[in-house]
Amino acid sequence: MKNDSLKGQHRINEQIRAKEVRIVGDDVESAVYPIAQALKMAEDHEADLVEISPNAVPPVCRIIDYSKFLYQLKKRQKEQKAKQVKVNVKEIRFGPQTDDHDYNFKLKHAIGFLQDGDKVKAYVFFKGRSILFKEQGEVLLLRFANDLEEYAKVEQMPLLEGKRMTISLAPKKAGSPKKAETDTAKKENPKKAVETKE
């Protein structure tokens, strides 16, 4: 794994300018040492003296192989990035008098977006006097939300902003198929579902 992007961000060994440093870590006693002694300790450990907190007084260092240090840092950054879930918002535009063919086409796209984990913002755009059909636009968006009930939850009900009426939908967290099948069985035949469970 390449760590080139992280190199040069830390002073190591003779690059450290402080006269004394605080060393932390598992294999050494945490204390303040003169820089010459700290460098000797790093050499004895066949490792590097890495400055990890340059603004502290005195600067904080670790005795560790610099390549290993960069690897750990890169790994930690990658884990943090993985935790940050990026949510995309897909927009779907309707006219106030959208026909069924166009509606179903856009509904299919919305289902795909939601299944991919994206949010959907659907809106009706009113041109000129078509603003007179705003109630029709609201009905259309509510129908859209109702048809997507299996895949999405409503984050924002239809809201008119200028010439656009918008509704916001977020994907539902999918439950396990096994649980869904069990729930269906209970609804269809409660007694049989109980017997199966036993």
From Swiss-Prot:
Q: Which residue ranges does the record annotate as region Disordered?
A: 168-198
Listed Gene3D superfamilies:
Translation initiation factor 3 (IF-3), C-terminal domain, Translation initiation factor 3 (IF-3), N-terminal domain
Task: Tell me the gene name.
Answer: infC
Return the protein name. Answer: Translation initiation factor IF-3
According to its UniProt entry, the protein's GO biological process terms are: ribosome disassembly
Q: Known InterPro entries for this protein?
A: T_IF-3_C_sf, T_IF-3_N_sf, Translation_initiation_fac3_CS, Translation_initiation_fac_3, Translation_initiation_fac_3_C, Translation_initiation_fac_3_N
Name the residue ranges with Basic and acidic residues bias.
Answer: 178-198
Q: Where in the cell is it found?
A: Cytoplasm
In its UniProt record, a GO molecular function of this protein is:
ribosome binding
Record's function text? IF-3 binds to the 30S ribosomal subunit and shifts the equilibrium between 70S ribosomes and their 50S and 30S subunits in favor of the free subunits, thus enhancing the availability of 30S subunits on which protein synthesis initiation begins.
Partners and quaternary state? Monomer.
Pfam family membership, one = IF3_N
